[in-house]
Amino acid sequence: MAYQLIAVDMDGTLLNSKKEITPRTAAAVTQALARGYHVVMATGRCYRQIAPYMRRFPAMRYAITSSGAAVADCMENRIISSQNIAADTAAGVMRAFVGLDGFPIIFSNGEALYRPELLNDPQRFGMDAYVDNFKANGTAAEEMERSFLATPYPVEKLDFYFTDAAERAKFLARVQGAPAWVVPCESAGVEVNATGVDKGSGLQALCRCLNIPVSAAIAIGDSENDCSMLRDAGLPLAMGNAIDDVKAASEYVMPDCDHDGVAEAIERFLLAQR
């Protein structure tokens, strides 16, 4: 099988531990794009939040955003596939959060809405690495939860970051059985998407749009929310810093995010093809 596309998770995969793209990785991505391969960011971030990274690669056209809820054509600045959480389901999940020590984020129409208090003490919620991106590409919303619960609307995704894993466990217990897909992320975070929506469904939707068999796609990641696209891709790859479930779902383990794992994957499995 000749591979035509690689879907690349961002945090802990494309980005190193400093949230940077290394020179070798940038060069490999640029070379793959120049040779006509699709290099696709597959991320939990919304469309607006990936804009600074997309600008690094003018030839990069597509992105899987909000953990598969929205697939974007970045050159035409439009969403080509979207699957939102229903308003009543999103409201129920938000109500389950009320009273817990955490930080909610609403992803809607390519935007990330957050409470401005995030900027006061981001380290408390494990969000310090994301502050600059939120300042530049997020939308601060006063009394966000109260406003949303008063007038719910469909959303791409809900994220919650808690002070610790114990507080996250309380939330997970409350939303057990909710008609949504609830996936833990990072050390004390949770992502919520519509049922059936994940990075794997986003990858399938993009492949259909491009008329590419999903078996011709490579996927690489490090976290639990990457497992779905690894299961669907023709070649699943794990980063060296990946959790055990990701490594178990992969055919090969690349170096970690601080040692150019994505660059090696592109060089070895795309650029080396004849």
Annotate each predicted stretch with a short phrase.
Residues 1-5, 16, 21-23, 190-274:
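Mg2+-dependent phosphoryl-transfer enzymes with acidic/Ser/Thr/Gly-rich catalytic loops
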Residues 10:
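Residue immediately C-terminal to the conserved phosphorylatable aspartate in receiver
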Residues 20-128:
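Active-site phosphate-binding/coordination module
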Residues 36-40, 60-61, 156-157, 215-216, ...:
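Short active-site oxyanion
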Residues 57-59, 66-67, 75, 175-178, ...:
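Short, structured coil segments at secondary-structure junctions
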Residues 61-66, 124-127, 182-184, 236-240, ...:
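Short hydrophobic/aromatic-enriched beta-strand-loop microsegments
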Residues 68, 165, 240-244:
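Short, polar loop motifs at secondary-structure junctions
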Residues 96, 100-220, 224:
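Conserved acidic, metal-coordinating active-site core of Asp-based
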